[in-house]
Amino acid sequence: MERIRLKLKAYDHRVLDRTVAAIVEAVKRTGADIRGPVPMPTKIKRYTVLKSPHINKDSREQFEMRIHARMLDIVAATPDTVDSLTKLDLAPEVNVEVRAMGK
């Protein structure tokens, strides 16, 4: 079969690492070869808002969101590997993007 690339994103890195560990364990049980997890750069989104609703522009508050990401490559995936990945119960906070790639 082809190579499968998984990109996982989450706001909490602890939940992301637990999910990656569960995926790696499930893939290794089926006998497929896995590359990764590769930690991707953390994306930081910053927002600045005024504290006051009317005046005083000098008084501001800053917020940020950190998006942590990991990448996994499953090489020589078998049908059992795909079946175990679809049956895996993952955390709802983690966004998983799956792409099947050529050899």
From Swiss-Prot:
Sorted UniProt keywords: Ribonucleoprotein, Ribosomal protein
Keyword Transmembrane helix carried by entry: no
GO cellular component: ribonucleoprotein complex; ribosome
Gene Ontology terms describing biological process: translation
SMART domains associated with the record: Ribosomal_S10
Gene3D superfamilies documented for this protein: Ribosomal protein S10 domain
Bridged cysteine pairs (disulfide): none
GO MF assignments: structural constituent of ribosome; tRNA binding
PANTHER family: 30S RIBOSOMAL PROTEIN S10 FAMILY MEMBER (PTHR11700)
Record function comment: Involved in the binding of tRNA to the ribosomes.
Annotated NCBIfam families: PRK00596.1 (NF001861), rpsJ_bact (TIGR01049)
Subunit-structure text: Part of the 30S ribosomal subunit.
Family membership noted in the UniProt record: Belongs to the universal ribosomal protein uS10 family.
Protein name according to UniProt: Small ribosomal subunit protein uS10
